[in-house]
Amino acid sequence: MAHLSLNQYKCTHIIIHGTCLSGLYPVPFTHNAHDYPHFNIYISFGGPKYCKTALNTYVIPLLHRILTTQFIYTYANITEKSPPKSPKHKNILSFNNNT
């Protein structure tokens, strides 16, 4: 597997969507890199309250080992008041390579 530098390819983005329990989420995560140019990686999970703990314990450390130059930019915990099929209905973990 070749190493991909997001610093060289500004438009490169990785999208992961799912739940902490079952893996893939049935509704596609539709945000694109050009919608939010300062975001490079979107990780969207829905599920129980311990989902954030699972992300902090397993997913984030793994990504830090893979993407050693990437830094967590923001974490938005969206409430259930959002429309069910809206991308904002999920917990969004965003990485930024401009730090």
Swiss-Prot record:
Query: Which Pfam families has this protein been placed in?
Result: DUF468 (PF04318)
Q: Which InterPro entries match?
A: DUF468
Annotated stretches, region: Disordered: 80-99
By sequence similarity, the record places it as follows: Belongs to the UPF0320 family.
- Reproduce the miscellaneous comment text: Contained within a telomeric X element core sequence.
Q: What is this protein called?
A: Putative UPF0320 protein YDR543C
